[in-house]
Amino acid sequence: MRPLILVTNDDGLHSPGLLAAAESVSDLGDLLIVAPATQQTSMSRAFVTGDDIGAIERHDLRVAGRTVAAYSVVGSPVVAVTHALLELADRPPDLCLSGINYGENVGGALGVSCTVSAALEAEAHGVPGIAASVQVDVASWRKFDDLDWSAARHFTRALARQVLADGLPSDVAVLNANIPRDATPNTEIRRTVQSRQPYYVHSLPEGTRVPTDPLRLRIAATVDADQLEANSDIRAIVCDGVVSVTPLSWSMTAHTDWQPRAEYLDDGAPRSTR
């Protein structure tokens, strides 16, 4: 039986990046394309609620010259993935491919990334995941600008082939791949670590405002090159222009010798004798 590949994203069913992801693996297995009904950028691993959450609609999507069934789900990417696995898949998928996202997911941005979170949600159900993103200007996140997807398809396909053939190590949940805007299929690919820098930084727009009025914060990709880790995802894609692949795990435990100190546990407050 051919592998079953779940293809999802956070940009919505009609994103060119989702189509590029599906095309990159279309001959590697059977496709199950399930994505949010609307743009869901920066929702992280939110299980949103609402009267219409979980509503599913079938669509026909042209992928590599053939018509493939695709499904939109009202809700966040993790809601879409959960419904895909619980009620749309006819068997457990062999791989979840999340992307290809408009906008790189590196450094502190992983904490809010739906592209990464969708792949992690699949892994929570036992399905290995790849999160793939391509570097674009922040202004392009929601506009679906025309892009050359050839390099992104190339590297996404290569990683998918490897995961389908070899699986992932037991301590790896997801591969987080980021492709530079000017990459070609010959661009170097590098294993990296997640940078501790936040990368996307918010600021207030200029001018005055009425506090009760809505306000959209400005956001910009920001790098402190002098403090950037040598083997980090940000350095790879932003400074060196190479493809970054970071193996991610579920653990958020810091490797430190920190211990709670007894002198702070006794604050002089009365304690129960019961």
Q: What residues fall within each predicted segment?
A:
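A cross-family phosphate/adenosyl-ligand binding-site feature
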Residues: 1-5, 16-87, 91-92
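Electrostatically charged, flexible surface regions
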Residues: 43, 147-274
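Alpha-helix C-terminal capping segments
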Residues: 84-90, 117-128
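Short acidic, glycine-rich surface-loop motifs adjacent to enzyme active sites
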Residues: 95-103
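Glycine/threonine-rich flexible loop motifs
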Residues: 104-113
